[in-house]
């Protein structure tokens, strides 16, 4: 496999020659440029979906042969044979998944039907099936994986689905599309789609891998693909990996993972340009982002200016609008020069209605912006003010997703408690300021505050917990878990911790839970046996007594097995917990008699001692 390494000799001459050779490749007219060309147009069929244009890239600077040229080498079955060919029939009836781009105003959460993509992921393992595929078939499959991965993540972050750690199916969609993307990337790298692969398909594959932060897989696939251009019988496959849309993903990953130096990134970028041909907005935006991260603000501003020029020529091109939005927030979150960053922040928060593109004020960029301001000496009062303005921006735009608010609240409280790990009059004053500046004191605000608060004083912690009642914020199951977890950092008595545990169980019961979930067991462990600040025999024995009392309330037999197996790593804990399996009613150094409330929904679901006996039998030396 070809490797580009950062050596004293710089880029390998072989790679440079590949880029120079690619610059002579055929091109197609671009939807974002007014440049005229005599090259053939992209003849890929379009969908009836109004979002199709988001994914169809008619590349002005393409380094690959036009899709129409590739298509002529594929023998598509005739209509008469298609009816008798079950593979062709399935390909023709494949229902592609779409997602709505972020910059589309009024976007709603997508409803995803995974059936067709699931079936395709299985069928594509069959060589005979792959041989029936066309370039369009492969692209539609890759685009479906990409869109589904985005939609599934949105559903999770927007809390349109209930994701319980004990429900294995809740992770299924994420793992399914991650596995599908990896499998498709491996098949492409292995040369299993020599006629079907195209630059637009590669872009979808790379972008999906990027969604899952699979940086090594991205670079390995790209380097393998570039190396393929050495083969005499592989046509333009190697050139496809030098397409601007593909490079827009690869170069960012290469920079972030330190695979290439900044200078090498610029050399690759400059060699990918073709005279008198436009640069794809995605590549312009990514090079701008990389420059901003590197502190090359002049180049970042140049990229923004070029994108604005493209916008003036084609103000409705979604690729340009999305690129403008992304490079704008990159200046906010990634620019270490806070004078520049604050100017873009002001534009986004106060003047967004006057911008030609929609600002997507992503929470991680906001947090990075606040951290940069803090690092360069901004007062906490000023940081709270900027945080409050962002919150108002989200409320005004109806973008108050729980995950987004938790992220920016976490960033704010981390700054506060890093400055004040111990309570003081000044710290208390600033914490009260966050309450005063918060326009919507809700569960997410209070949960995040308690999660990050390192203060151990029981009175101070109780004052914060009382804010749920003071501001009429109902405590959810998550709130009760967070309060219980935090008890591990507070000087509570075992009786007070038991009260918090009982409050959690009553909330579970009122919400219709039939079992005590793994997240609940994790919370009580952090409050007792895993307490770093106040670990004691009293807390340890309280935990053992709770497990003894509620051992059969776990979700099912498998949950009970996982519960005990997880304790094997700690010999002391395992020795005590295993007694609940091997002894009928064990007593501990300090015995707590725990009274079980009358539940309406919580119930015993397993015979814990019987189920977990296989674990203790397998590890007799640890008893």
From Swiss-Prot:
Subcellular location: Mitochondrion inner membrane
The keyword 4Fe-4S appears for this protein: no
Record's bilayer topology term: Peripheral membrane protein
Principal location listed in the UniProt entry: mitochondrion
GO cellular component, one term: mitochondrial inner membrane
GO biological process: sporulation resulting in formation of a cellular spore
Post-translational modification: Phosphorylated. Phosphorylation promotes binding to RNA.
Keywords from the UniProt entry: Membrane, Mitochondrion, Mitochondrion inner membrane, Phosphoprotein, Sporulation, Transit peptide
Signal peptide: none
Disordered as annotated region, ranges: 20-49
Keyword Transit peptide attributed: yes
Compositionally biased intervals (Low complexity): 27-49
Domain of life: Eukaryota
Feature: transit peptide: 1-60
Family: Belongs to the RMD9 family.
Subunit description: Monomer.
The protein's role, per its UniProt record: Binds the 3'-UTR of mitochondrial mRNAs. Involved in the processing or stability of mitochondrial mRNAs.
Protein name: RNA-binding protein RMD9, mitochondrial
Organism the protein comes from: Lodderomyces elongisporus (strain ATCC 11503 / CBS 2605 / JCM 1781 / NBRC 1676 / NRRL YB-4239) (Yeast)
Gene field: RMD9
């Amino acid at each position: 496999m070809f490797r580009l390494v950062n050596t004293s000799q710089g880029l390998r001459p072989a790679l440079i020659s590949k880029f120079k050779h690619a610059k002579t490749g055929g091109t197609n007219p671009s939807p974002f440029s007014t440049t005229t060309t005599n090259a053939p147009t992209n003849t890929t069929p379009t969908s009836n979906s109004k979002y199709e244009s988001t994914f169809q890239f008619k590349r002005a600077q393409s380094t690959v042969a036009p899709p129409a040229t590739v298509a002529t080498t594929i023998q598509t079955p005739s209509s008469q044979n298609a009816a008798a060919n079950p593979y062709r029939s399935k390909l023709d009836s494949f229902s592609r998944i779409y997602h709505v781009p972020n910059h589309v105003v009024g976007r709603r959460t997508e409803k995803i039907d995974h059936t067709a993509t699931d079936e395709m992921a299985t069928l594509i393992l069959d060589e005979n099936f792959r041989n029936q595929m066309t370039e369009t078939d492969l692209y539609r499959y890759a685009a479906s994986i990409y869109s589904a991965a985005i939609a599934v993540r949105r559903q999770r972050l927007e809390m349109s689905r209930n994701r319980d750690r004990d429900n294995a199916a809740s992770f299924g969609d994420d793992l399914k599309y991650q596995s599908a993307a990896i499998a498709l990337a491996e098949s492409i790298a292995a040369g299993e789609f020599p006629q079907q692969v195209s630059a637009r398909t590669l872009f979808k594959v790379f972008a999906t891998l990027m969604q899952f932060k699979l940086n090594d897989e991205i670079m390995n696939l790209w380097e393998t693909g570039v190396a393929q251009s050495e083969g005499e019988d592989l046509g333009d496959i190697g050139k496809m990996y030098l397409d601007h849309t593909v490079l827009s993903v690869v170069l960012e990953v290469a920079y972030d993972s330190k695979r290439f130096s900044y200078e090498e990134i610029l050399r690759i970028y400059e060699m990918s340009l073709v005279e008198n041909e436009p640069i794809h907005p995605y590549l312009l935006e990514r090079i701008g982002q990389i420059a901003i991260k590197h502190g090359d603000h002049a180049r970042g501003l140049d990229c923004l200016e070029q994108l604005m020029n493209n916008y003036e020529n084609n103000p409705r091109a979604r690729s340009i609008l999305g690129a403008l939005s992304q490079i704008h927030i990159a200046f906010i979150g990634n620019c270490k020069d806070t004078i520049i960053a604050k100017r873009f922040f002001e534009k986004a928060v106060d003047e967004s209605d006057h911008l030609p593109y929609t600002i997507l004020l992503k929470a991680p960029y906001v947090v990075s912006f606040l951290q940069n301001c803090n690092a360069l000496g901004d007062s906490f009062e000023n940081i709270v003010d900027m945080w409050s303005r962002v919150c108002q921006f989200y409320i005004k735009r109806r973008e108050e997703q729980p995950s987004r608010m938790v992220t920016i609240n976490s960033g704010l409280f981390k700054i506060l408690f890093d400055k004040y790990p111990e309570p003081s009059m000044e710290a208390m004053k600033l914490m009260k300021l966050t309450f005063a500046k918060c326009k919507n004191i809700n569960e997410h605000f209070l949960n995040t505050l308690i999660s990050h608060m390192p203060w151990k004083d029981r009175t101070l912690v109780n004052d914060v917990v009382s804010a749920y009642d003071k501001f009429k914020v109902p405590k959810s199951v998550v709130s009760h878990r967070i309060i219980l977890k935090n008890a591990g950092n507070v000087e509570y008595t075992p009786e007070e911790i038991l009260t918090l545990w009982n409050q959690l169980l009553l909330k579970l019961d009122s919400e219709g839970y039939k079992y005590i979930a793994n997240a609940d067991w994790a919370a009580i462990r952090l409050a007792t046996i895993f307490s770093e600040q106040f670990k004691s025999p009293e807390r340890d024995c309280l935990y053992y007594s709770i497990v003894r009392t509620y051992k059969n309330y776990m979700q099912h037999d498998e949950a009970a097995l996982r519960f005990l197996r997880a304790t094997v790593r700690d010999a002391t804990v395992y020795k005590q917990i295993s007694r609940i399996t091997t002894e009928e009613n064990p007593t501990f150094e300090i015995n707590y008699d725990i009274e079980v409330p009358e539940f309406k929904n919580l119930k015993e679901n397993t015979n814990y001692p019987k189920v977990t006996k296989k674990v203790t039998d397998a590890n007799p030396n640890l008893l």
